[in-house]
């Protein structure tokens, strides 16, 4: 009876293979659900690394599965994402300029790679779960959290599985009227560089990058400055890694949001707006904030299919080291590709021809694109080197340094000056839990700075040596929670019932045990875990650690939550007295962690 009912419900939930879900990046028609598990960092001798006095760690590792195979994602914080004299500017309704220097070095933006894969790379935001992309076995995968409360579930998908908002290719507005012939390029490449030229090419380059968000884009995101800042940070973190093969480091030196009105008329004609922006940078921006290059992110719809425009070979020029980019798609990877493309033009790189290739494609400097781009072609790298030797731009040779502050100390101006231990702004604006905004001194040790939010969390106390609240501490894994209904696991209290409720709604609960016995079959519909691409049936004691079954309250059914591969019981879920799920098996809680 149960098996027959299961078939009927599966047909209702999966009318065709490939379920669809709306994620932050758009509508995804095929995806895999994974549960990334953080791997504790160990010092020599197997002792766990002590928690740093920062909100985010410098290095992290996460383990999860891709196509049923385990992978380990190594992450390292992009410490050079922000210049040390990074500032943020917005405008009051009356037009007053408001510039601050917020503490941004303890951020959550990472680069990384997949363990044991030499050519892999990753760009990840770890602010709230894992969001970004990584390369695995020659293919690019995107990852982002599923919006399920108290769950570590993430979706992994490929670009081809995202339904495009618009199938029309994005186009760069740069017109190619001065291309050299293939023959002349070949002749140029045959010259032998002098030792001085080789040294110049090998020197690491630094671009202090300034981003302006226009008023249309500000209003499009409902005047939400924090959301806009996160979007820009994620974009520049992605841009940064694209320029690594060119030995260029992109450091964000400033972010400006035109929150009251545009500072010049932003027009649909991209060439006109680019010219106006270059003049504004030269006459207004540079006198008050140094930068090597500035880009305008705009909410305007440029004429035709144009989404960006830039000057070619113009870096370090006061009125031409600029580009404009339309924020045309909710997917950060697409807009970041356009930012990279236009900056490539500033660095002397033209559009790729049909003979230019890169792996994986598409190439960054293609004139038309419908997918994110991650690599410069060999043609682009050659043109960049030729531009460097021809123009010798000097502004990109200086490593970003902090600006000395010599003015009298003022508590509340965001600058840590002589006699101050911290400065988080005014008492009304301060967001630093362990800095006394009135005195600009650290709060005393044992001052509670973060309360425990539930059974599986612990309160945090200031150290007296830092303005930041220590890293969020969690109750140990295996600690009883929710009146012994389950055990803590990585800060959550996972139960089968709560998993059904979050996936299907408050009118659902966990199915009776008879449904879970189906997991002993090990077929496409019911299993415990994957090993080498094979679905392994559950042992009798493990059935509640395999595929999840739910039912409407006051009914007896075996409903599978919607997902192409089903939803599995979350790691750490209670499967018996003193027992928890771990890798598809029901094990003793005392030995599970």
UniProtKB/Swiss-Prot annotation:
One of its GO terms (biological process) is proteolysis. It holds the Pfam family Pep_M12B_propep. Residues 1-20 form the signal peptide. One of its GO terms (molecular function) is toxin activity. Disulfide bonds join 316-395, 356-379, 358-363, 411-440, 422-435, 424-430, 434-462, 449-469, 456-488, 481-493, 500-550, 515-558, 528-538, 545-581, 575-586. It is found in: Secreted. Ca(2+) 3 binds at residues 457-458, 460, 472-473. Glycans are attached at residues 319, 490. Ca(2+) 2 binds at residues 410, 413, 415, 417, 420, 423. Transmembrane segments: none annotated. Its main location: secreted. Zn(2+) binds at residues 341, 345, 351. Its EC number is 3.4.24.-. Ca(2+) 1 binds at residues 208, 292, 395, 398. The keyword Signal applies. Negative results: does not show autolytic activity, as encountered in viperid venoms. Does not inhibit cell migration. This is Zinc metalloproteinase-disintegrin-like kaouthiagin-like. It comes from Naja atra (Chinese cobra).
